[in-house]
């Protein structure tokens, strides 16, 4: 009847408003770099030489967000610039103005890197972390430098078995965001691999909400 139709319409309108509000909040968090260190926030907001952060430049499908965030850790906040000279100028400015600390990746320098990890075999289990990333070619050398020895596994038991078989040649990260690095160090606990606290998850959720909002 008409009452039921009106009620359903009201629910749809309310749901749309909720989605729009959530999307706006997430977009603001992305733009203001909420969750970044103060130095990185300053650089990304004020420096023309800054091309964005690493988190801005990579896309990861939802099943792998926790794993990639755990593998990259604070490197997600890396500020990207082209030249080493720009990186030095940015850091000098932060020091002079006492505006915090930041880590800067100079893409030109990284592109000339020759020390690529070249194991003689692959681990007995795991998916290369690089295979779940979408990233522009210009940023791929940096992604390789950070993740070329990292493999995604189901759990720490599988990570341990693969680590032993390879005698510590690789880093492993689980879908839940736990890690076992090449030194044999385990790291785990509560992870934020989705939602507003996740630097990668925010963008995924915004994309999903945009689809729902039409």
Protein language model features and the residues they cover:
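Hinge-like oligomerization/junction regions that interrupt long coiled-coil arms in large cytoskeletal
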Residues: 11, 17-214
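Repeat-solenoid scaffold signature
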Residues: 1-13, 17
